[in-house]
């Protein structure tokens, strides 16, 4: 949100426009192809980056947000290929191990002021390390009367939330994982299947019809999805489109399995039938491109190429 607000404020300074991309853990070529699709430049291997460098010219300086960066090696290769481009890059990440960039840490303001952001669960503030996501989830559980503050505090302590341990990933936050653990034990199989799909889908957000189809739950998913929403386990960035916070996704992925090939096939078939949905579904297409690259599946890569030609990109 801060990156979007910054882009809105500086927009007049960039004749080449302000552009936002969700990048995740995709490889450098997929990142390049994302920009090529947006800018209408060639996407073949040999012309991909030279064409982007020409597009990002001194005459058209461009502001580009690369949101939710995860793969340092892929990002380093991508940015190094475009180091001569006339673009201002804003990269958002929970952590960054790149040289050649300037780091601007962002901290929730009430944390630095020592104030309570969620009065209903104020006693949990220190226990949850002032983490806004964990506090929001705890507040949702308490406000929905799923559990009271005292019982939740006891659960967290019994789970070792106050212990010091090494984490395996920047999204491995014990205070959030424990809240997910509490909820998971109380969710029905349909709700768990919905969470599993959202945890393994690589696009930004998933339409309700796609979510129910991939989870194989049909209309039976409505009630469980509403419960997930009340408990703030899911996000609804657009009406009828659902996603997980990256930290919640990490906590769910470790306990679920989903056939990623089925997700790949679903979104290619969807866009082949409904090319008018490209704007909302484009990150799923980029995820399919990355899947085809990493699996070295020539047939699927050619299918994606035909789809892109149909879409006029």
Predicted features, each with a name:
Residues 1-2, 29-36, 81-141, 151, ...:
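Alpha-helical sensor/transducer elements of the RecA-like P-loop NTPase core
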Residues 3-4, 135, 139-140, 181-265, ...:
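C-terminal boundary/linker of central alpha/beta nucleotide-binding cores
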Residues 4-15, 48-118:
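A conserved switch/coupling segment of P-loop NTPase cores
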Residues 18-27, 108:
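A short hydrophobic beta-strand->loop->alpha-helix junction that borders the nucleotide-binding pocket
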Residues 39-50:
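Short glycine-rich substrate-engagement loop in P-loop NTPases that contacts/grips substrate
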Residues 52, 176-180, 248, 264-267, ...:
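Hydrophobic alpha-helical core bundles mediating ligand binding, dimerization, or RNAP-core interactions
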Residues 136-191:
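Loop-to-helix "switch" segment enriched in basic
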Residues 190, 258-313:
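Extended alpha-helical scaffolding segments used for macromolecular assembly and cargo binding
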């Amino acid at each position: 949100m801060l990156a979007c607000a910054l882009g809105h404020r500086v927009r007049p300074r960039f004749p080449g426009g302000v552009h936002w991309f969700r990048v995740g853990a995709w490889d450098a070529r997929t990142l390049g192809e994302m920009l090529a699709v947006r800018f209408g430049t060639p996407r073949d291997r040999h012309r991909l980056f030279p064409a982007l460098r020409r597009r990002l010219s001194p005459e058209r300086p461009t502001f580009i947000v690369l949101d939710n960066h995860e793969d340092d090696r892929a990002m380093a290769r991508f940015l190094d290929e475009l180091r001569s481009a006339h673009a201002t890059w804003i990269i958002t990440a929970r952590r960054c191990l790149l040289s050649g960039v300037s780091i601007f840490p962002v901290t929730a303001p009430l944390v630095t002021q020592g104030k309570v952001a969620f009065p209903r669960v104020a006693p949990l503030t220190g226990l949850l390390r002032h983490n806004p996501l964990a506090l929001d989830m705890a507040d949702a559980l308490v406000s929905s009367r799923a559990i009271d503050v005292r019982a939740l505090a006891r659960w967290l302590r019994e789970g070792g939330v106050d212990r010091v341990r090494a984490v395996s990933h920047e999204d491995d936050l014990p205070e959030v994982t424990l809240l997910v653990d509490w909820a998971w034990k109380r969710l029905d199989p349909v709700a768990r299947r919905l969470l599993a799909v959202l945890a393994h889908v690589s696009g930004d957000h998933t339409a309700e019809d796609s979510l129910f189809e991939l989870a194989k739950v049909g209309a039976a998913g409505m009630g469980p999805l509403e419960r997930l929403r009340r408990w703030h386990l899911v996000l609804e960035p657009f009406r009828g489109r659902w996603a997980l916070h990256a930290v919640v996704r990490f906590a769910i992925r470790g306990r679920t399995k989903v056939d990623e090939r089925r997700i790949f096939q679903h979104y290619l078939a969807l866009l082949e039938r409904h090319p008018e949905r490209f704007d909302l579904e484009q990150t799923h297409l980029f995820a399919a491109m990355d899947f085809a690259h990493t699996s070295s599946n020539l047939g699927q890569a050619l299918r994606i190429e035909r789809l892109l030609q149909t879409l006029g990109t």
